[in-house]
Amino acid sequence: MRVLIVKTSSMGDVLHTLPALTDAQQAIPGIKFDWVVEEGFAQIPSWHAAVERVIPVAIRRWRKAWFSAPIKAERKAFREALQAENYDAVIDAQGLVKSAALVTRLAHGVKHGMDWQTAREPLASLFYNRKHHIAKQQHAVERTRELFAKSLGYSKPQTQGDYAIAQHFLTNLPTDAGEYAVFPHATTRDDKHWPEEHWRELIGLLADSGIRIKLPWGAPHEEERAKRLAEGFAYVEVLPKMSLEGVARVLAGAKFVVSVDTGLSHLTAALDRPNITVYGPTDPGLIGGYGKNQMVCRAPGNELSQLTANAVKRFIEENAAMI
């Protein structure tokens, strides 16, 4: 059986789809998946053993110059790659009109997705041949697992979902694996940032622990923040610019991770590493860290500025058994 997945973004959403593949792989021996995903996240599906072909799409970039000759050529090549197979099923796990119209509609195969009541954008359901009712008040991982089970005709397992990508990195861990913590400090929303002075205070409080700390970054302004956080601390390393796979390798070797609510926090969860995520305004119940050893540290009044470094340090100590 060959199935096409349409789940293009974001990083967390793409990662949250992986346990559904593991369920399907266990329920339907020999099943293989192709996956349409935004080019920036194209490495992620390749880490799962059930994925045979990754088809990158660049809707975010294309829409800036949709009718230019180079972009038209890219769109034509994408359509040819998408239509090269006749699929037993096409599962649109994105639930948005944009992806349904520009990707799902063009694919060959019976198209499955969430129904009018439960799709993220109800109009997207008009592009599906089979519409499935998937209750909204459950974690995103469980919603996707249920969608795959209903689309492919098996019962959703009652056990916790398995991302099944940690083993991809086990044979190539950093030489200092287990000797450091990683602090993913960057996120896209201002109200999800933990103040820099709190990060620096936490780093100082860990001085006697013997643990080294690594700071990842993606954009230039994130690198500047990382440098400010590391200033004056000999045991803190600002990582070089890395591919997503490179960052994943560092996370896979971490003793533990302290993170804001960001894509790298979800990647840590997918790699089964102990992870303390500090939450302010977002609800971890529906889109938070999912998996083994995932710990939620809520800010008082949902205001991250009110969450002190001492409180996070105590949280680390109280959960030492999981770390």
Label each residue range with its predicted role.
Residues 1-323:
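Catalytic machinery of carbohydrate-active enzymes
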